[in-house]
C-alpha cells in the first residue's frame, strides 16, 4: 500500500518510533502510534479544557509500521487525539474513518467522559447498509481525550513488599465500593485512589490479616449506553478502553500520581497491590459498536476477525470483540502495559480476566502462546504475581489447571465443591479431600506448587458469603433485565427462608455456615481469596451480578451489627491461625503416602470412628463427616528430613446432627487441644482431650485441634 508523504511542518520533526505513546523528554513530546494499514495519521491538539481542537498535524514519519513525530514545544498537560486515514472496507476488516477522534492506546491519562452520540460510530446509524455505510460526523465533542503526563514521582526508599506465595491471602475489592460508605473516609475522596489511602480503612485491612489487595479494574473504561439509559453504569469496569491510564473518576486530584501515592500507602502498610486487568476485549464492541480507539487505528491488526467474513468479530469474550494477542504489536501493547504498571506504578501482581483468551491461537488455547511465554521470560513480569481466570466464552475455553508453571489460577472447583459440601449434597467427600489439599489433581504437575490453586468460596461475580447462606435463587431485578442476568449455578441454600428473617434458629445456622465456609477457605492448602465485606457478613440482597449497581447495593456497608462484629473477629482468628501454623500452607502437595524413612504420612484421612478412610468410606454417598490429620513431622521440602511443624487435626461435619468422632491415638501424656469450633466460636478455647478421646462434633461444624506433646501447656 503506497503512502503519500507531505512536507514536514516546521514545528514537528521526525522523532522516533519508540517508545510508543506520547513521551515527554523535558523539552518536547515524541508521539508514536502503531498502524500497519493506515495511509495517514493526524495528531490533533486540544485546548486546556479538551473541548476545542486547536491544531491538526500530520505525523511525518512511518518506520516499521509506527507513525511518529516530535513536537519540541509540547509539554505535560497537552491534550490530544488521533485521526487515522485508510480504507473503509469492513468486508476486508478495515474501518478507518478520520472523522472519528481516537484515543492513543498508550495514553497515560484520559480527560473527559464519553457521551453517547450517533457521531461515535464509524457508520451511519439507521442506514440500510448498517455498518457498511460511512458516517462523516465529527466525534471529537463526545469522546474522552488523551493527555501527556510528567511521570516524575519521588518514591520512599523501602524494599518491595513481595509477600511469599505461601503466606499470601488475597482480598478482592472494588476501589469505589470500599470507601463510598466508610464513615472515616472524607466524602470528597470517597470512591477514589485517595480514599483507599485512609488510615482507618487500611488499618482494617491490615488487622484482618490479609496480605494482598486485589482491585477490580481501574484502567480507563466506558459505561455502556443501555446502562446509562436505564440510570445505571458499568460499576465493575470490565469494559476497558485505555490499558495505560487509570479511570478518570478514580482520581480525586485529577493527577495520575494519586495512584502512585495509593500504592505507597499500601506498601507502607505491608500490603501488596494486585490489579484485575481486562486485556481480552475492549469497549468498542462488535461490528455495530462505536469507533473510539483501536477499531479506527487498525481494526484488522488489533482484533480477531472471522476468517471468511472479516466484517465480523470473533467473540470469545462474550462482549462483542476479542483482542488478537497473536499479533506481535498487540502482544507488545499488552506486555508494555503490564510492565508500565509493574515498574512505573509499582504494582505487585495481576489477575487476568478471561485469561484463556490471552493464550488463544486460531486452533484454541496453547500454553506456549507468545503471551504466556513472554510473561514467563520477562525479567519484570516473571517476578510479579500472575493469576489467571482460566476460562472464556469460546470453544474449549475452560482451562482450569491448564496454565503453565509460574501462574496461579482461580479454582472454581474449590468454590463449587465447598459450597455443595456445606449445603449437604451427597457424595462430596472424595472431591472435598482434593480441594482441601490444593487440588493436586489439577495443579500437581511440572513443579507447580499448591499456591497455584487460588481458592475462593465467593468472588465479585456471584453471591456474597451472607447471600450464599440466605438465598436459594438470585434476585437481580434491580438490574433491569427481568432477572435473566447472572448465573443460576449458585449452590446456595437459604436454610428455610428466602432472604432476611427474624427466626433466631435460621439466623444462628446461617452464621455458623458462614463460619464453616470461611474456615474451609482459610485453613485449606493453596492461596485463599476473601471478598471485601464477607468478613463481616455483607449482603447484596440476593443480587449475584451487581456489575451495574454503583450505589448502596454494590458498596460495602461498614455499619456492623452484632453478627457482623462476631464474624469479623472470627475471620481475624482464622487468618491468625493460618499464619501461625506453616503446616496449613505447605509448599508441597499433600499426597497421603507413607514415608518409610520418616515413618509418617503427610496427610491421613479419618472416618468418625478414628480409623483411616477406606474405599467403602469414600464411596458412601451419604457420608458427610471427615477428619484431616496433618502430621507436622512430614517432610516439608525435597530434602529428606522430618518437619518441625505442629500436628493439626481438622474435622468437618456437614451432617445436620452431631457426630461422635474418635480423636487419633497419640503417645501417652500427649493430648489434643481444641483451637477452633464453629459451633462454639466464642467459647474459651484450649480445652485438652486425652489419648483416643471420643469428641462430640456438633452438627454442621468445623473444628481444629492441635496435638500437644507431654507436659505442654494448653493453647489459649
Predicted regions and their residues:
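Structural recognition of the beta-strand scaffold that forms the well-ordered cores
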Residues: 169-172, 212-214, 242-244, 349-351, ...
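Carbohydrate-interacting/catalytic domains
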Residues: 1-171, 176, 193, 205, ...
